[in-house]
């Protein structure tokens, strides 16, 4: 976009022309702001889609773009298409819990989910009622056929966090491309 100069003389028609040029410039900036947030949000969505691990079929990413008088705002949304029903056997019978694929992808569970990126304020993901989440030895569980399995938990793939990092990394580059 570069610098724009508006020349004005002290006449009614010159002032009117300057106002028209300013309004046109305002629309141009608004359009560029929309392009900017659209491109950044697309980078975020593509990054998030590439970091969902085995939960990809349960998570849909989209964006909402809201142009307003102050510029433009974009929000990236991660929506679940459903819950995963996890079932296992215990001495008391079959247990079941609905698991959020979105939370599992973002935060993981168990010992493997100890905030691998050291994101401030993010704790270790756990299953509801988990007793062994912080046990470095992991835990054992029986499937519905009675077979014993060992687990350390689910490693988080952090799709939304990685989307944020990628957008931050590209913010200046995209701004230069869009605004010049």
Where are these regions (language model features)?
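"Short basic amphipathic alpha-helical interaction patches in structured regions
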Residues: 91-95
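Mid-chain, well-packed structural core segment of small domains
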Residues: 84-88
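Short, Lys/Arg-rich flexible segments
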Residues: 1-83, 112-180
């Amino acid at each position: 976009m570069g610098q724009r100069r508006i020349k004005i003389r002290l006449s009614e028609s010159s002032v009117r022309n300057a106002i028209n040029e300013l309004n046109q410039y305002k629309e141009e900036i608004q359009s560029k702001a929309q392009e900017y947030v659209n491109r950044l949000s697309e980078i975020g969505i593509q990054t998030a889609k590439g970091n969902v691990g085995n939960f990809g079929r349960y998570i849909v990413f989209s964006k909402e773009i809201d142009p307003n008088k102050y510029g433009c705002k974009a929000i990236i949304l991660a929506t679940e298409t459903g819950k995963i029903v996890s079932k296992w056997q215990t001495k008391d019978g079959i247990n079941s819990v609905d698991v959020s694929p979105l939370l599992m992808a973002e935060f993981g569970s168990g010992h493997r989910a100890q905030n691998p990126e050291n994101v401030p304020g993010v704790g270790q993901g756990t299953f509801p009622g988990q007793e062994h989440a912080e046990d470095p030895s992991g835990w054992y569980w029986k499937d519905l056929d009675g077979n014993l399995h060992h687990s350390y938990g689910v490693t988080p793939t952090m799709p939304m966090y990685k989307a944020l990092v990628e957008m931050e990394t590209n913010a200046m580059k995209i701004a230069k491309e869009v605004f010049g």
